[in-house]
Amino acid sequence: VSARVAVGALALAAAAAVAVALLRFEDGAAGDFDYYTLALSWSPTYCATEDPGGRTSQCRGRPRAFVLHGFWPQHERGWPESCYSGNRPWIPQPVIDDMIGIMPGKGLIIHQYAKHGTCSGLSPEAYFDAARKAYESIRVPERLRRLSRTLSATPAEIERAFLSANPQLREDMVSIACGPERLREVRVCFSRSLEPTACGDNENQARLCRSRRIRVPPVVD
């Protein structure tokens, strides 16, 4: 009897796991989301922590400050992803060529559309056009664009610098992500019509950066 119970329990667990997987896929319906998060990645941190040898195109050649990591459809809590079935969506080469100036590589562009862009309900052309418009609407504080030495700052100080440079933003529209004790990203939230909007729980500041002070590596040593 105990063996039958054990087998039955395993079957129920397997069925539950399948149900969760299906639910997650169904939750990822294209076009079903509340707002976008524009993720601006601080390239010097990525290169210092993930690619110190300069193997990727992002970390060799001309130094970069903020690059576009992604433009993510979000729910107020949680997010959809990979809203397609079958083969990975095809991105036209002209779209890739247009985005390569603000995103650090072809692989990232393809990955971001497959994982996040498909959930926008937009074609690659329309999705990346929206991402570029959001990206270009944000002014990077002058000090960060030309940072020549490591800066020590609190997340709140970095946020205030962005608010000062972008009067259209409010405090609840911007979050700072860090780790380990370095600036990783600045995230700005946009409505579906590409207007700045309040962020949901996904951009909870206390969760994204627990450090009281963080280092901002320089663009140029």
Predicted regions and their residues:
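Hydrophobic membrane-insertion alpha-helices, especially the h-region
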Residues: 8-21
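N-terminal module-boundary/linker segments of secreted carbohydrate-active enzymes
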Residues: 23-53
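Positively charged n-region of N-terminal signal peptides that target proteins for export
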Residues: 1-5
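Short beta-strand-initiation
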Residues: 6-7, 183
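Domain-level detector of nuclease and nuclease-like folds
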Residues: 37-39, 50-221
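Generic low-complexity, intrinsically disordered sequence content enriched
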Residues: 14-16, 26, 113, 148
